[in-house]
Design a protein with these regions (language model features):
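Helix-coil boundary/capping segments in enzymes
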Residues: 1-327
Length: 327
């Protein structure tokens, strides 16, 4: 059985080098044989050891857990927010360069590696131009959405043409935490609050904005993929329906939420079982967060979840093949 890891991180080293040469934030700085990413005017940073740009090491870790037929879908992850903190022209150049490198890896590893696009959302026209190139010319299989675009949220009305175009192109919109929201109250404890709860809050609010704003209502074919088993949302769906009656929405928020696809990056089987019960087996995608989490650990959690053969096949393979058009 082909296994599709939908939550895999790899970056071309050229991207980190370009960001290291920037004179202002966001940027990276060289640390030994790796880097660290500095954002929010330098108040936040993420260590980026060499494994982040070692694709062979990423493949090796995946194969050791799920065998040589493993396929990876590469997402920008936390760094999706990097472009949207930059001046628009700089972001345009870097988005093109990044997407070209991701597409190059896809060509070098056909059927093994699939890439997703970064776009400069601070300028809608630029974002549309980059999106069309990434999907139409480079054959990338999705587009990444940060939690914030500068000081704007993802439901800014000017972004409506972007969501319309994503739906028309029939590629998924990937919502991964970007550490750009709520930073003032998530500090301290060696980033323990940010990394444990903050990132889930970040992506959960992003998805709620897509729902409350009517974006998912206006674009019923838009496929949204939320990482980390749906963050906080499946556990509070009843409260969301109770407290958030949105004028103009013909359905309860939870009805849109159940359209969302979520991955299995969650270090306990209880979370997986809850996600399965809430979203249904057709909406769950296998993911490892490699290199941030161990593929072996990701498999162990699913093994502990007592899945039927049919559900395992959907999670490990067929759902992702459909969402990312891999067949």
């Amino acid at each position: 059985m082909r296994v599709v890891d939908t939550h895999f991180h790899w970056f071309p080293r050229s991207h980190f080098e370009t960001m290291a040469n920037r004179g202002s934030f966001p940027r990276t700085e060289r640390v030994g044989d790796g880097y660290r990413y500095l954002y929010n005017e330098g108040r936040g940073f993420i260590p980026l050891p060499a494994v982040w740009f070692d694709l062979d090491a990423g493949f090796s870790a995946s194969f050791s857990a799920t065998g040589p037929d493993t396929v990876v879908v590469c997402t920008t992850g936390v760094l999706a927010g990097m472009l949207d903190q930059m001046p628009a022209e700089d972001a345009l150049d870097e988005a093109y360069a990044y997407n070209e490198e991701i597409a190059r890896a896809q060509r070098l590893h056909p059927g093994r590696f699939f890439g997703t696009a970064a776009v400069p959302l601070q300028d809608t026209a630029m974002a549309l131009k980059v999106l069309d190139h990434a999907v139409g010319s480079l054959d990338l299989r999705g587009v990444n959405l940060p939690s914030m675009i500068g000081s704007e949220t993802v439901d800014a009305s000017r972004l409506e043409p972007f969501y319309e175009r994503v739906a028309e192109l029939d590629v998924p919109l990937i919502v991964h935490p970007t550490d750009l929201a709520f930073n003032e109250v998530l500090t301290g404890y060696a980033d323990g609050i940010q990394r444990s709860i903050g990132r889930l809050l970040d992506s959960s609010v992003t998805v709620l904005r897509l729902i409350f704003s009517g974006i998912m209502e206006r674009h019923p074919t838009l496929r949204v993929v939320q990482t980390h088993a749906g963050g906080l949302l499946p556990y509070q769906a009843g409260r969301i329906d109770k407290n958030a009656r949105i004028e103009g929405l013909p359905r309860l928020p939870s009805e849109y939420l159940k359209r969302v696809f979520v991955d299995t990056v969650a270090p306990q089987s209880l979370t997986i079982r809850t996600a399965l019960e809430y979203y249904g087996a057709d909406n769950i995608l296998y993911g490892t967060d490699n290199p941030c989490w161990s593929p072996q650990a990701a498999v162990s959690v699913l093994d502990e979840s007592a899945l039927s053969d049919e559900v395992r096949r959907k999670i490990y393979s067929t759902n992702a093949e459909s969402v990312f058009r891999l067949t």
